């Protein structure tokens, strides 16, 4: 069926200004034609088109006004999403005068919420969804960009008053999207879907898929600006063990360096970083340290000297190294748009060069918008000059992208190409998913910031960046205890899971809030670790099939209109629905369970509801509203260790939630958790679990993969089994049958199988009779 879904330039807003040469630089000519051009340009200067003032700063535009723009009309679409990063609702809003969505990467400390201002990252990619169709627009431009949105709702009007019944016609709604960029070319991709999954795949063909993360990075991360010294690190690490709380990575902020000189260590505070890392290694944990793009101007700092000697810094208009103030004081900024600079920067992570680093050290890229104190909007001036003589205005939003790229490549190179990197970045662009994780920046310890984190992460997720998270507890300020507990509970069900706080905040380790609250935080973190097999499998699908890990409901239920504007609950993969508690002193939450033919099971109580309705769920402070979708199988770990490294050989459990038809399906992806062997040598296991006609089958989902594993499935829980079985047996691939002891609960219609020993890597069946 032919259907017009998108029109280009229907409002006639196509605009393109070519680069010009400043008239004063032209050779003087006496003819009147040249004189008239000069006069025209002088008039443009008077209008600020060639020279613009921002406070005390003057932005001289070497090539004159160079903006571009184009409008798109989306037919029948009223629900739009994407164009992160904004602390705004998931569904994009109509914009008014001076209220456009701004894409301009900025260091905004304690950013305002429900605001269209630009913050740390930009992805110029918009999705539109309606019943039966999803489309996308990818506006590939790294300069400052504004996006205006205006929806014309559907209207019904009378064609004629003739006859007994007036003829009526309904005009479909239309949404107009106007893209405007300060400079660059018009390079736009239209993604026609028609399904959300199709659009995700089409976009990933252009920008890449989410990098497969090392397993440790899906665990809990403990960070603070700053842990004081090696003894502090040792004490915090021991505190997690003492309180039986798992965690995987300790983080060090800028104070670990010698005067904010990156790739160095403070000799008084961290005199023996290798020994500190060996302590963490003995606990099967990692260390993450910060590395920012500004380099302290210091003739005794080798990184600065080598970069300056090779001309690797961004330049000012006079051709000298651009200088700005950041954490170390006066600094120069590496020009990551230059491939040679990226190659050199990557080499700095080699173990002989980065002294004190080991193979358990990973990286955090911050301040890479780039942040420049005391400059316009606290960033680099637009007329700074990059590689190829391009002005900063042309590529501002991609600066942090290149920084993370060079860092990730450095971590890969130091291992000889064998090990996966982990790099967290604050600034990002389309395609940043290929190099690591992103977080929402300097949030505040308030309930409203917990609440806004959900739509912010959903927007990142559908624009390709699945590995995303928000600082637990809020970076700025001191959260009340209830808020901190609720934030841990929410964060445990979000992709990147890190506690972080500014240097002015009180210490915030999980055991500092009383015994009961420590228990609640411990339970939330342990729930995360128990679900790591499911998380890891979801990231594999994000990596190979472009499917978001954290999904808005409309992605999973694209034909259910009520889901289109929901942002307080979401799906993890296709199996789990999560509704974090984001209000203080809440005693109930209203949870919408979608799908008229679905059945949903409370993850803890096993109570079940039919889909297509809103249910009021009572919540105490220990309640995390999570529901498993009927028809799914979720793999878990039956025991939780001190970190992911302690759990590689521990047993699995399967949570089988039956659909209304009595069937279920699920998957497990497994590899060594750290190397590229899954890619180069096909060293992985991909298993499929299917339940039908009272038989659970474990089979291979991908015959190409081979990975030796002694792990067994120890427990199986079947939800929605309406009749108690007479007996249960296992049937192995060698033809042997074994009876299985079981427990059936009629109240919850659940069947529990314990003390099994079914190898995860081999085919087998469990028969319920």
Curated annotation (Swiss-Prot):
Q: List the disulfide bonds.
A: none
Any one Gene Ontology MF annotation carried by this entry is:
carbohydrate binding
Catalytic residues identified in the record: 366 (nucleophile), 369, 442 (proton donor)
The record's EC number reads 3.2.1.20
Q: Which InterPro entries match?
A: Gal_mutarotase_sf_dom (IPR011013), Glyco_hydro_31_AS (IPR030458), Glyco_hydro_31_C (IPR048395), Glyco_hydro_31_N_dom (IPR025887), Glyco_hydro_31_TIM (IPR000322), Glyco_hydro_b (IPR013780), Glycoside_hydrolase_SF (IPR017853)
- Report the top EC class in one word: hydrolase
**Which keywords are on file for this protein?**
Glycosidase, Hydrolase
Example GO biological process term? Answer: N-glycan processing
Tell me the Pfam families matching this sequence.
Gal_mutarotas_2, Glyco_hydro_31_2nd, Glyco_hydro_31_3rd
Q: Does the keyword Hydrolase apply?
A: yes
* Catalytic reaction list: Hydrolysis of terminal, non-reducing (1->4)-linked alpha-D-glucose residues with release of alpha-D-glucose
Q: Cross-referenced CDD domains, in alphabetical order?
A: GH31_GANC_GANAB_alpha (cd06603), GH31_N (cd14752)
General function of this protein = Has alpha-glucosidase activity.
What family does this chain come from, according to its entry? Belongs to the glycosyl hydrolase 31 family.
Protein name per the record: Neutral alpha-glucosidase C
Starting at the broadest rank, the lineage of the source organism is: Eukaryota, Metazoa, Chordata, Craniata, Vertebrata
């Amino acid at each position: 069926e032919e259907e017009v879904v998108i029109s280009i330039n229907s409002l006639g807003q196509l605009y393109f200004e070519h680069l010009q040469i400043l008239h004063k630089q032209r050779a003087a000519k006496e003819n009147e034609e040249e004189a008239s051009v000069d006069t025209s340009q002088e008039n443009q200067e008077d209008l600020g088109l060639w020279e613009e003032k921002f406070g005390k700063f003057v932005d001289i535009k070497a090539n004159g006004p160079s903006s571009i723009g184009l409008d798109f009309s989306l037919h029948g679409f009223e629900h739009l999403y994407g164009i992160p990063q904004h602390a705004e609702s998931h569904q994009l809003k109509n914009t008014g005068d001076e209220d456009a969505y701004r894409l301009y990467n900025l260091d905004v400390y304690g950013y305002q919420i429900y605001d269209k201002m630009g913050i740390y990252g930009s992805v110029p990619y918009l999705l539109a969804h309606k019943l039966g169709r999803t489309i996308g627009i990818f506006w590939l431009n790294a300069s400052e960009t504004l996006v205006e949105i205006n929806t014309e709702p559907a209207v019904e009007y009378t064609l004629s008053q003739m006859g007994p019944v007036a003829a009526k016609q309904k005009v479909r709604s239309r949404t107009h999207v106007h893209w405007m960029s300060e400079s660059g070319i018009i390079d736009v991709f239209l993604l026609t879907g028609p399904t959300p999954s199709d659009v995700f795949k089409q976009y990933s063909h252009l920008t890449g898929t989410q990098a497969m993360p090392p397993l440790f990075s899906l665990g809990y991360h403990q960070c603070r600006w700053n842990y004081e010294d090696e003894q502090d690190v040792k004490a915090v690490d021991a505190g997690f063990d003492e309180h039986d709380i798992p965690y995987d990575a300790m983080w060090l902020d800028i104070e670990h360096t010698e005067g904010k000189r990156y790739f160095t260590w403070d000799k008084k505070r961290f005199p023996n970083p290798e020994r500190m890392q060996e302590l963490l290694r003995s606990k099967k944990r990692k260390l993450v340290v910060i590395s920012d793009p500004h380099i302290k101007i210091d003739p005794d700092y080798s990184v600065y000297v080598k970069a300056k000697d090779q001309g690797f810094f961004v330049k000012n208009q006079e051709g000298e190294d651009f200088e700005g103030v950041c954490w170390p004081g006066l600094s120069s900024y590496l020009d990551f748009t230059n491939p040679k600079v990226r190659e050199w920067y990557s080499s700095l992570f080699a173990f002989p060069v980065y002294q004190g680093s080991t193979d358990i050290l990973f990286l955090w890229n911050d301040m890479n918008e780039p942040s420049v104190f005391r400059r316009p909007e606290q960033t680099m001036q637009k007329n700074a000059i990059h590689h190829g003589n391009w002005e900063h205005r042309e590529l501002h939003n991609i600066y942090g992208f290149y920084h993370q790229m060079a860092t990730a490549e450095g971590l890969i190179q130091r291992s000889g190409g064998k090990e996966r990197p982990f790099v967290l970045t604050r600034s990002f662009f389309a395609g940043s998913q290929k190099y690591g994780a992103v977080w929402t920046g300097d949030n505040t310890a308030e309930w409203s910031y917990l609440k806004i984190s959900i739509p912010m992460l959903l927007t990142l997720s559908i624009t390709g960046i699945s590995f995303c998270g928000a600082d637990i507890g809020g970076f700025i300020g001191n959260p009340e205890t209830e808020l901190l507990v609720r934030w841990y509970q929410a964060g445990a069900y979000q992709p990147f899971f890190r506690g972080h706080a500014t240097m002015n905040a009180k210490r915030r380790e999980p055991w500092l809030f009383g015994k009961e609250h420590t228990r609640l935080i411990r339970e939330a973190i342990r729930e995360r670790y128990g679900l790591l097999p499911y998380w890891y499998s979801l990231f594999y699908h994000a990596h190979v099939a472009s499917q978001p890990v954290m999904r808005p409901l409309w992605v999973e239920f694209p034909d259910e209109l009520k889901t289109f504007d929901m942002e307080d609950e979401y799906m993890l993969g296709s199996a789990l629905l999560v509704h974090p508690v984001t209000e203080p002193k809440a005693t109930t939450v209203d949870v919408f369970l979608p799908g008229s033919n679905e059945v949903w099971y409370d993850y803890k109580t096993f109570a079940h509801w039919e889909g297509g309705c809103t249910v009021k769920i009572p919540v105490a402070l220990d309640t995390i509203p999570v529901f498993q979708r009927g028809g799914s199988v979720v793999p878990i770990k039956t025991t939780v260790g001190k970190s992911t490294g302690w759990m590689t050989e521990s047993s699995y459990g399967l949570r089988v939630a039956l659909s209304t038809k009595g069937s279920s399906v699920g998957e497990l992806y497994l590899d060594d958790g750290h190397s590229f062997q899954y890619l180069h040598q096909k060293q992985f296991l991909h298993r499929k679990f299917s339940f039908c006609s009272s038989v659970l089958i474990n089979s291979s989902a991908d015959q190409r993969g081979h990975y030796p594993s002694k792990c067994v499935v120890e427990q199986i829980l079947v939800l929605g089994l309406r009749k108690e079985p007479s007996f249960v047996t296992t049937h192995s691939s060698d033809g042997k049958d074994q009876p299985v002891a079981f427990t059936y609960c009629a109240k919850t219609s659940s069947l529990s199988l314990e003390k099994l020993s079914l190898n995860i890597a081999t085919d087998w069946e469990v028969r319920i009779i």
